[in-house]
């Protein structure tokens, strides 16, 4: 699978969750958005070419302490089969980082089909 990933969070510069295990946000929570624009690839025989999706996540404290909540957003053109494949990836049930570690720490509380727009490139990107 190839594509581009985007990650935004409420931590101060140098996300403590990724580097130290604990959020360094002002309120001690971990809130963020992880977005993907899959250029090409498959999961279980399902083509994911062109899929845009995002996980809007929140943990009350450190990620590894659990109790996280997640809402997934997919572009309206995403099929039910693609959504099922993405659910397997993001839940961590297929293995592979980071979702093998993140999936068990959060509960999915919703799925939304909304238009996802990506603008710019590199550090000037918006999602």
Describe each model-derived feature in a short phrase.
Residues 1-41:
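N-terminal ordered "arm"
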Residues 13, 25, 29, 41, ...:
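Generic detector of intrinsically disordered, low-complexity, polar/charged segments
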Residues 32-58:
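Short, intrinsically disordered, low-complexity segments enriched in Ser/Thr and Pro
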Residues 50-127:
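Internal, well-folded beta-alpha domain core
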């Amino acid at each position: 699978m190839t594509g581009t990933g985007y990650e935004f969070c409420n931590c101060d510069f140098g996300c403590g969750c990724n580097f130290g295990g604990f959020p360094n946000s002002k309120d001690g929570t971990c809130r963020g958005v992880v977005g993907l624009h899959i250029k090409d690839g498959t999961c279980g025989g399902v083509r994911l070419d062109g899929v845009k999706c995002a996980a809007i996540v929140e943990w009350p404290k450190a990620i590894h302490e659990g109790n996280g909540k997640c809402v997934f957003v997919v572009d309206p053109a995403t099929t039910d089969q693609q959504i099922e494949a993405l659910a397997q990836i993001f839940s961590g049930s297929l293995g592979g980082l980071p979702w093998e570690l993140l999936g068990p720490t959060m509960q999915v509380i919703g799925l939304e089909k909304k238009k996802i727009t990506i603008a710019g490139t590199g550090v000037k990107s918006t999602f």
